[in-house]
Structures are given as C-alpha cells and as structure tokens.
C-alpha cells in the first residue's frame, strides 16, 4: 500500500547552494509517514490513544539529485518490512519523475516506554498491500 504526500519546496528549506538542505528530507518523510499510517487505517492519534507509540529507531538517506526552491516534491511511502516489534518504510522523494532521495526509516513499537510486539490487529494492517 503506497501513501503519497506532496509540497512545494519553500525558500526556507534551501541552503546557500540553492538546493534543499539535507535535514528537510527527513521532515518531508515525517509528514508522509502520517499519511502512510493513516492509509493503513492506523491514524497516529488512534495509536497513541491505545498506548502504542511508534518510535524512530533508524533512518538512512541516499541522494541521487537535488530538489530546489520552486520545485514540488512528492514523497511516496511504502512498507518494506514488518518485524515482530518494528516496521521499515521506504520513502521515495522525487521532483516530477526524477528521484532525489530514498529514505528508509525503521519504527519500533513502544508501549509504556519499552519495545513491544505490534498488537495483532496493527500487525495485520501493516502487512496489508
């Protein structure tokens, strides 16, 4: 199941080289992650209300081209792997058809401040599509 988020590149997101500063790619994937969770029928506020707190364990970024001020970026999010206590999501950031960056983020299910297995219904939704 793919979720999509899109936004114009803002001037404030660019550095002196005229390209998007690297940290903003993680901001965009964080925005896209909300849509990804929601697409799986797991809105963030519902997870939190149940005491489920997905925490970022790791993110890796691999750039292939730059996004610049005035571009519109699109982030596609897709489930890459579901573990007992974790899920890895691949975010592809692009301008038009040009891939700018691929980000892989692993979230760990936490409950009460410690890692916990995904509840069965959550795991089932994460593995759909």
Give names to the regions the model predicted.
Residues 58-62:
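Short alpha-helix capping/helix-loop boundary micro-motifs
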Residues 1-56, 111-129:
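Hot-dog-fold acyl-thioester-processing enzymes
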Residues 1-5, 63, 67-72, 79-129:
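HotDog/MaoC-like acyl-thioester-processing domains
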